[in-house]
Design a protein with these regions (language model features):
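Walker A/P-loop NTP-binding motif of AAA+ ATPase domains
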Residues: 3-224, 230, 242
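C-terminal engagement/docking regions of AAA+ P-loop ATPases
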Residues: 1-27, 37-53, 225, 230-237, ...
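Amphipathic alpha-helical interface segments
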Residues: 241-245, 249
Length: 320
């Protein structure tokens, strides 16, 4: 378990591209009620911070980044709860650890308790599961929303359980009931992918040259088109691989000319071009055709659940 101060979290909402609608809903539904309770409760007793928020969708779409930014922007104390923290070999010790987590959260409130891959620790209860696992889930739910969940003056505690998963169907129904705010973070559509490209490449030198036929050497529209089916993480890695191509070329040219590598200068490296994304080591090239189609099919189960959100349903295009 890690207790993190908001100032120690380096991620803000400005660092996340393509999820503006979800970010605005998180501000209105979580941050403001959590940090300005007097404003919301003074208007209506219904306007309290939610007891739980669930971010679900395919891997690499920004769920963990949203959680970090939410903790930073809210100014609330952030508890990063690892699954291993709740696991002990002695009978009953895991229950005590759960109670200790909530005791700390109450003393530090407003608090956000983040559980990544929440389905692994709070999955569906089954008749054949180990007794200790069932007791941990029962203790967690009791501390979260039970007789001891209110403050000493009878008010609502300002503790928000924030979970992230790509297997929402495996989470116990009682847990889902305690998480009234659910946000699908699905694969980005064209406009979202463009925002991700713009944000990722904002500090990268771009080749502004125009070809003889009028096409730009760096065509972001082409990248947006062929990256359909890629997650935000995939796009970032593709940009990272592409940004290395001009540097690799410059180093190779220096070696061939016999010049001293100590004299290498960053300003002599050419700008990024569209072709850098499709070379032998280009990130998009590696995800194109069969590999990308297999990846997309493997995500269908989660994608169907998340399709009600702002995700992409576009067909993947090949780049010739």
């Amino acid at each position: 378990m890690e207790v993190v101060s908001p100032g120690e979290i380096p991620v803000t909402f400005e660092d996340i591209g393509g999820l503006d609608e979800i970010i605005e809903e998180l501000r209105e539904g979580v941050i403001y009620p959590l940090t300005l309770p007097h404003l919301y409760s003074g208007h209506s007793s219904l306007l309290t911070a939610p007891s739980g928020v669930l971010l679900y969708g395919p891997p690499g779409c920004g769920k963990t980044m949203l959680a970090k930014a939410l903790a930073r922007e809210s100014g609330a104390c952030f508890i990063n709860l690892h699954i291993s923290t709740l696991t002990e070999k002695w009978y009953g010790d895991s229950n005590k650890l759960v109670a200790a987590v909530f005791s700390i959260a109450r003393k530090l409130q407003p608090t956000i308790v983040f559980i990544d891959e929440i389905d692994a620790v709070l999955g569906q209860r089954r008749s054949g599961e180990h007794e200790a696992s069932g007791m941990v889930k029962a203790e967690f739910m009791t501390q979260w929303d039970g007789l001891t969940s209110a403050t000493t003056d009878g008010g609502n505690q300002r503790i928000c359980i924030l979970g992230a998963t790509n297997r929402i169907q495996d989470i116990d129904e009682a847990i889902l009931r305690r998480m009234p705010k659910k946000f699908p973070v699905s694969l980005p559509n064209a406009s979202q992918r463009r925002q991700i490209f713009d944000l990722t490449l904002k500090d990268t030198r771009i080749d502004a040259t125009v070809c003889s036929d009028g096409r730009p050497v760096f065509d972001i529209s082409a990248l947006v088109r062929v990256s359909a089916g890629m997650s935000g993480s995939d796009i970032k890695e593709a940009c990272r691989d592409a940004a290395m191509v001009p540097v690799r070329e410059h180093i190779k040219a220096l070696k061939q000319s016999g010049r001293n590598m100590r004299g290498i200068r960053a300003e002599n490296v050419r700008g990024l071009q569209t072709e850098d994304f499709f070379g032998r080591r280009g990130g998009i090239h590696q995800l194109q055709q069969q590999d990308l189609k297999k990846t997309t099919r493997s995500r269908d189960e989660v994608h169907e659940v998340a399709s009600a959100g702002s995700g992409s349903t576009e067909q993947v295009d090949d780049f010739d």
